[in-house]
Structures are given as C-alpha cells and as structure tokens.
C-alpha cells in the first residue's frame, strides 16, 4: 500500500507539472509569432541592406599589386609624352639656367585598370589616386629646382578609360641648367634644352617617346621675354647611357633664343662710342691748355672703366673673350691713346722750347737784324716761315724784339740740320717739322683716330652681327 500511494502521488505531480507548463508555452509562442516578421518583410529588409551597403569599386585597385609596372616580365611598356609650355619665366646668364612652367602629360595602358562601361566613357580622378596605382617615374635631367603647383589643390589629373588607357597630367614649374656660350655676347643666340627621362626603368622596361612627334610640343603664342626673342621650339629624343645602370630613353624640349640688341646698344655701345668721340675733342684744344686736355682725357678714361665694370658685373666670369669685351677694350685703347697723344705733344713742345732757350743764350745779340725771310734746309728762304716764327701761326705775330729772337733760333736750327744733311736729309726734315710744328700731331690725329675707329666698327659689326 505504501508503494501504491507513492506511485499515485508521483503520477499526480507529474501531470500537474505538465499542465502547469502548457499555458506558459502558448504565451511564449504567441509572443514569438507576433514579433516574427513575415517572409515578404525579410525579403524587403535584405534589399534595403544591399542598396545601402558600400558599392564595389570599378577599378579594383585593391585586387592588384601596383608596385610592379604593367605587363611585368614582358616587353617594355610604351609611355607617350606631350608637353604644353605655359610660360618661359626667366633666363639667367649669371646662373646659366632658365625657369619654365608647363603641363606634362603621360599616356600609357594598364589592363589592371580596365572596367566595364556600356557608354565607353572615361573616369577622371584627382591626385589622390596617383598614390595607389603605377605611374611613370619621369624626372627632369639637369634640373636645379622643380615643384608641382598645389593652389588651390594639387594640380594633378588622372583620367582612366574603360580599356585601361590612362592619361596622367600635371602642372609643373622647373628651373633647369642651360649651357650658354657668351663668345658673341650680346650679339648671341642661345639654345637650351629641358630633358625628360625615366629614373628607374631602362629602355627594356619603359619606352618613353613623343606621342605625336613635333606636334607633341605646344606653346602659348603670348610667351615673350624682355631680353630674348624666342625663335624656335622643337623636340628630339635619344638614348642616354649610364655605366652602372644601362640605357634610358631621354626626351628633349629644345628652344632657341636670340638676344635683343637694342638694350645693349643704349646701355653699352652708344655710351662707349660717345666717350671715344669725346676724347677726340682734345685734338681741337690748344696744346698749351694743359688743364683742359688732361682733365678731358682722365674723364673719358674713367668713364670707359666704369662702363666695362658695369658690363662685367652683370655677366658670369668666363675664361674667354666676348664680343662686347672686344668693343669696349678697343674703345678704351682709343681713349687712352688720345691721352698719350697729348703727352707726346706736350713733351715735344717742352723739348722745342728748351732748345730755343739754349739757342737764345748762344746768340744773345739780335741788333739790326730785320730779316723778313728765313732759311730752309736747302739754303733758300721762305717768307711764310718767317711769319710763322718757329711753328706759331701768322695770327700770333710777336713783338719786334721777340720776333727777331725767334728768327735767330729758327736760322740756328736750320743751320744745324743743314750741317747734318749727310746723315739723312729726309729724317732731318721730318724731325725739324715735328719739332717746329708740334700741333701738326693734333692735325694728323683729327683724321687718323676717326678713320681707324670707323674701320674697326665696320669690321666688328660685319663679323658679329
């Protein structure tokens, strides 16, 4: 009996437990059914998630390794280049360089950047994509300074076409070296070159070429320089060899400049010519006016020195002679010779006066001597020389006593030279004429100096112009 009681009690408890759990299961199931979305709602929720999710990029930049060039291991990738010169900013003779602003464009094909497109339209990007893909490593050979413009943003444009063709453009200002020859300065023409080359890839990996030949280089018609006339722009290309790395394709932008001469005519040639002509004025000044002729000669010499110094200060120090140096130094020699010419005239005048003074002391008595004629070298007399009184013109007729002294001096000189005729008559005549007429050197200089300077100018401009 106790066993039967225990079994009945156990069954009763079990049934009570089952019955007590049935309502709770229904409430839980009902709550789940009311909060459970329908099948249609789940489908709409998935569509929303697809629409608002992150779109997959068309270029698939993350799927490729762009540290390697396109078609790595195959033939060299061709990279076309064209350039549009925006401005030629400056030419420096002292630093031997030039500054140019240009648009540099590269063209190549990278199949890794191909994307599907029904309209075959390209996609344009700014400079941020350049850091994620492969671009040609072109640099400027012999450049001193260069930079990419960044106002208001980096002036870089990347355009990708559906078939993988890429256009890469940037705006650059570069200062590059230009080897100049100043042997004809300022009547010279200079040819400068801007050279482009791949830094790392040899001609076996990258073939750099002008995309459209000479048409690949375009210039702005408004480009002008203050001191130069731009004559010609043209392109060339060749291979450059480095002993440690190999052969590289190199592109050249060549341009020829011809210097404007008018500025230097006003600043250099015209002042130098005026100084030479001013030095000739001393030939028309009386040789007895020592202060006037000396001061004029010194002034012209110093002015020429200033002109030469000013020209050299604005030019590089070269080890050869330039055309302007020839003109300035020849002009300086003409000015200096005009000073030496007066030194010779003054010296000969002093010697003549000393000789006359000695002869005056030798023949002190001139009483009753009223000759109106003087004796020449051959023993004859000349009335004109008597009036000239040993080289003085007729307009300067002296008092009677001094005139008689001059006549005696003149006769004494004639007698001395006549006695030495055997040593050379012609030499004595020329020496006597120069000593008696020291102003004759000025007369000859008035013709000789301008004539030689004109001949020099004709030769100079015919050779260098």
UniProtKB/Swiss-Prot annotation:
In contrast with rho-1 and rho-3 homopentamers, rho-2 GABAARs are not inhibited by picrotoxin. GO terms for cellular component: chloride channel complex; GABA-A receptor complex; GABA-ergic synapse; intracellular vesicle; postsynaptic membrane. It catalyses: chloride(in) = chloride(out). Pfam families: Neur_chan_LBD, Neur_chan_memb. Expressed in spinal cord and in cerebellum. Expressed in retina. Keywords: Cell membrane, Chloride, Chloride channel, Disulfide bond, Glycoprotein, Ion channel, Ion transport, Membrane, Postsynaptic cell membrane, Signal, Synapse, Transmembrane, Transmembrane helix, Transport. One of its GO terms (molecular function) is protein domain specific binding. Residues 1-20 form the signal peptide. Its main location: membrane. Residues 282-293, 347-443 are cytoplasmic. The chain crosses the membrane at residues 261-281, 294-314, 326-346, 444-464. Changing residue 299 to T: Loss of picrotoxin resistance. It is a multi-pass membrane protein. PROSITE patterns: NEUROTR_ION_CHANNEL. Disulfide bonds join 178-192. 4-aminobutanoate binds at residues 105, 169, 197. It comes from the Eukaryota. Residues 21-260, 315-325, 465 are extracellular. Glycans are attached at residues 120, 254. It is found in: Postsynaptic cell membrane; Cell membrane. GO terms for biological process: chloride transmembrane transport; gamma-aminobutyric acid signaling pathway; visual perception. Rho subunit of the pentameric ligand-gated chloride channels responsible for mediating the effects of gamma-aminobutyric acid (GABA), the major inhibitory neurotransmitter in the brain. Rho-containing GABA-gated chloride channels are a subclass of GABA(A) receptors (GABAARs) entirely composed of rho subunits, where GABA molecules bind at the rho intersubunit interfaces. When activated by GABA, rho-GABAARs selectively allow the flow of chloride anions across the cell membrane down their electrochemical gradient. Belongs to the ligand-gated ion channel (TC 1.A.9) family. Gamma-aminobutyric acid receptor (TC 1.A.9.5) subfamily. GABRR2 sub-subfamily. Three rho subunits (rho-1/GBRR1, rho-2/GBRR2 and rho-3/GBRR3) coassemble either to form functional homopentamers or heteropentamers. Rho-2 is unable to form a functional homopentamer. Interacts with SQSTM1. GABAARs subunits share a common topological structure: a peptide sequence made up of a long extracellular N-terminal, four transmembrane domains, intracellular or cytoplasmic domain located between the third and the fourth transmembrane domains. This is Gamma-aminobutyric acid receptor subunit rho-2. The gene is Gabrr2.
């Amino acid at each position: 009996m106790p066993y039967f009681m225990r079994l009945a009690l156990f069954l009763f408890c079990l049934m009570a437990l089952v019955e007590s759990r049935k309502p709770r299961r229904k409430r839980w199931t009902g709550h789940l059914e009311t909060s459970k979305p329908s099948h249609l709602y789940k489908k709409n929720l998935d569509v929303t998630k697809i629409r608002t999710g992150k779109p997959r990029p068309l270029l698939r930049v993350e799927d490729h390794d762009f540290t390697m060039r396109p078609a790595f291991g195959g033939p060299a990738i061709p990279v076309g280049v064209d350039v549009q010169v925006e401005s030629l900013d400056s030419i420096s003779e002292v630093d031997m360089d030039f500054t140019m602003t240009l648009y540099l464009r590269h063209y190549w094909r990278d199949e890794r950047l191909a994307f599907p497109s029904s309209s075959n339209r390209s996609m344009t990007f700014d400079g941020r994509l350049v850091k994620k893909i492969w671009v040609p490593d072109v640099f400027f050979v012999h450049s001193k300074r260069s930079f990419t413009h960044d106002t208001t943003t980096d002036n870089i444009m990347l355009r990708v076409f559906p078939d993988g063709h890429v256009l890469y453009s940037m705006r650059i200002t570069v200062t590059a070296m230009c080897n100049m020859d100043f042997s004809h300065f300022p009547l010279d023409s200079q040819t400068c070159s801007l050279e482009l080359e791949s830094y790392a890839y040899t001609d076996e990996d990258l073939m750099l070429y002008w995309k459209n030949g000479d048409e690949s280089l375009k210039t702005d018609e408004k480009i002008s320089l203050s001191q130069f006339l731009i004559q010609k722009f043209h392109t060339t290309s060749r291979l450059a060899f480095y002993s440690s790395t190999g052969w590289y394709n190199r592109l050249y932008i060549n341009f020829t400049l011809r210097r404007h001469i008018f500025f230097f005519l006003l600043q250099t040639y015209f002042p130098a010519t005026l100084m030479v002509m001013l030095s000739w004025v001393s030939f028309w000044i009386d040789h007895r006016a020592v202060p006037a002729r000396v001061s004029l000669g010194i002034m012209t010499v110093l002015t020429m020195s200033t002109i030469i110094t000013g020209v050299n200060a604005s030019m590089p120090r070269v080890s050869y002679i330039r055309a302007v140096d020839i003109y300035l130094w020849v002009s300086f020699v003409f000015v200096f010779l005009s000073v030496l010419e007066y030194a010779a005239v003054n010296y000969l005048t002093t010697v003549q006066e000393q000789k006359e003074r000695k002869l005056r002391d030798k023949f002190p008595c001139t009483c009753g001597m009223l000759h109106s004629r003087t004796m020449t070298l051959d023993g004859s007399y000349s009335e004109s020389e008597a009036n000239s009184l040993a080289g003085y013109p007729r307009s300067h007729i002296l008092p009677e006593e001094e005139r008689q002294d001059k006549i005696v001096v003149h006769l004494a000189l004639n007698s001395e030279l006549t006695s030495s005729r055997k040593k050379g008559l012609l030499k004595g005549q020329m020496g006597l004429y120069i000593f008696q007429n020291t102003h004759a050197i000025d007369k000859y200089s008035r013709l000789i100096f301008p004539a030689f300077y004109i001949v020099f100018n004709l030769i100079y401009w015919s050779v260098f112009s």
